[in-house]
Amino acid sequence: MFMNRWLFSTNHKDIGTLYLLFGAWAGMVGTGLSLLIRAELGQPGTLIGDDQVYNVLVTAHAFVMIFFMVMPIMIGGFGNWLVPLMIGAPDMAFPRMNNMSFWLLPPSFLLLMASSMIEAGAGTGWTVYPPLAGNLAHAGASVDLTIFSLHLAGVSSILGAINFITTIINMKPPAMTQYQTPLFVWSVLVTAVLLLLSLPVLAAGITMLLTDRNLNTTFFDPAGGGDPILYQHLFWFFGHPEVYILILPGFGMISHIVTYYSGKKEPFGYMGMVWAMVSIGFLGFIVWAHHMFTVGMDVDTRAYFTSATMIIAIPTGVKVFSWLATLHGGNIKWSPALMWALGFIFLFTVGGLTGIVLANSSLDIVLHDTYYVVAHFHYVLSMGAVFAIMGGFVHWFPLFSGYTLNTTWAKIHFMIMFVGVNLTFFPQHFLGLSGMPRRYSDYPDAYTTWNTISSMGSFISLTAVMLMIFIIWEAFTSKREVLAVDLTSTNLEWLNGCPPPYHTFEEPAFVNPKWS
């Protein structure tokens, strides 16, 4: 029974739960790696003593957080749980493929961990640029294992993307049009399209790197007529859509949370929100070289990538102001989930502003590979994606479990986390503007103050993570069951009870078409 339910599952709710648990576990591994990084940088001088090991930590931290925490939780966890419920589908379109998508991740994670256990580990940074990732600078199997790990995670995501696209387009009730689906469903659809189009390019790039390393090809080796810059183009053609893949489901969740706790029955500017997400998805594919302003591109190429990058601020602004307009005049309920959403809107906007700074190629040439870039993307990830995940979790936890969280503890948790992440990452803007480079285990004494403060902030965030574990334990032991849910007519996922039955629909859902 246990094996049939959890190993061979074809149920979107169980698979979603598996994704959430796996993501939470990987998230703690990733947090541990980040704390080791911050411990090393907490004061001048060495702690770990080996710069290769330091770079392995940085590389693993990025891979674990991106591929094994944010994506499994947002797309696999919330996506699997909510998309079928929100469109009235009995399950996903391909339930067994859904199971395989999940079970490809633990082996992938194992390969990534194994890569750091053998030889010297993969100390390449998450970008895995040759020639550093070539077979001279990284002899041994570490980078090869990392590449295989990425292949598995990529196949998992591609299959998941096919599943979500098919489910969302094909499994709505006949009377429901695409423009009647909730914004979270739209966000998962756009995300799935991005995954489907970008991951094959990454697979091509890392496969070429694999053959360069093992089969004497020279795709990225100038000695044989190759070009290492080609790898950067292939990687970032995936890498930039990837960062939008990480944030788009968060946009969808924030739209739901803001609407719900404003007491509104719909978000402000539904169509604008949909097309903003589609625009962001499209533009995300034509700005990749802004990660490469320092490789020596023509001035006209840099002018194009600068302006194209800035255009993304427009649909993003549409979303931010629509969230604020949704809040306007609402009957605001100050729940923990809304606090996460408001924190998301503010801090994501700050991260977006530093992104506008970095979009200027002339400025980026100075700021590239400094802590200013680290501060920028951690504001949009550590305070964008993670705040969206936390907000979504405290909002939908009663749906998933049937139990309610202690709201006082949940609010305290938010406040500790808010202080922690800001104390960690705000000083890094100053470090970057003063020229402190990324991916170094040590630094001149002049940078000590801000690094010490940053490391203190990371330990405050650790306290918040541990408090969250306690809060979840408290909810499951106290067993406060859900009494009533507001606004179910426009929040269909709550309509079948908390938690919903194992099989939501024993017969096709009926949607009255009169409103369309």
UniProtKB/Swiss-Prot annotation:
The chain crosses the membrane at residues 12-40, 51-86, 95-117, 141-170, 183-212, 228-261, 270-286, 299-327, 336-357, 371-400, 407-433, 447-478. Its EC number is 7.1.1.9. Cu cation binds at residues 240, 290-291. It is found in: Mitochondrion inner membrane. Residues 1-11, 87-94, 171-182, 262-269, 328-335, 401-406, 479-516 are mitochondrial matrix. It catalyses: 4 Fe(II)-[cytochrome c] + O2 + 8 H(+)(in) = 4 Fe(III)-[cytochrome c] + 2 H2O + 4 H(+)(out). It is a multi-pass membrane protein. Residues 41-50, 118-140, 213-227, 287-298, 358-370, 434-446 are mitochondrial intermembrane. Binds 2 heme A groups non-covalently per subunit. Keywords: Calcium, Copper, Electron transport, Heme, Iron, Magnesium, Membrane, Metal-binding, Mitochondrion, Mitochondrion inner membrane, Respiratory chain, Sodium, Translocase, Transmembrane, Transmembrane helix, Transport. Its cofactor is heme; Cu cation. GO terms for cellular component: mitochondrial inner membrane; respiratory chain complex IV. O2 binds at residue 244. The keyword Phosphoprotein does not apply. There is a cross-link at residues 240-244 (1'-histidyl-3'-tyrosine (His-Tyr)). One of its GO terms (molecular function) is heme binding. Mg(2+) binds at residues 368-369. Its main location: mitochondrion. InterPro entries: Cyt_c_oxase-like_su1_dom, Cyt_c_oxase-like_su1_sf, Cyt_C_Oxase_1, Cyt_c_Oxase_su1_BS, Cyt_c_oxase_su1_dom. Fe(II)-heme a binds at residues 61, 378. The keyword Transport applies. Belongs to the heme-copper respiratory oxidase family. Component of the cytochrome c oxidase (complex IV, CIV), a multisubunit enzyme composed of 14 subunits. The complex is composed of a catalytic core of 3 subunits MT-CO1, MT-CO2 and MT-CO3, encoded in the mitochondrial DNA, and 11 supernumerary subunits COX4I, COX5A, COX5B, COX6A, COX6B, COX6C, COX7A, COX7B, COX7C, COX8 and NDUFA4, which are encoded in the nuclear genome. Component of the cytochrome c oxidase, the last enzyme in the mitochondrial electron transport chain which drives oxidative phosphorylation. The respiratory chain contains 3 multisubunit complexes succinate dehydrogenase (complex II, CII), ubiquinol-cytochrome c oxidoreductase (cytochrome b-c1 complex, complex III, CIII) and cytochrome c oxidase (complex IV, CIV), that cooperate to transfer electrons derived from NADH and succinate to molecular oxygen, creating an electrochemical gradient over the inner membrane that drives transmembrane transport and the ATP synthase. This is Cytochrome c oxidase subunit 1. It comes from Balaenoptera physalus (Fin whale). The lineage of its organism: Eukaryota, Metazoa, Chordata, Craniata, Vertebrata. The gene is MT-CO1.
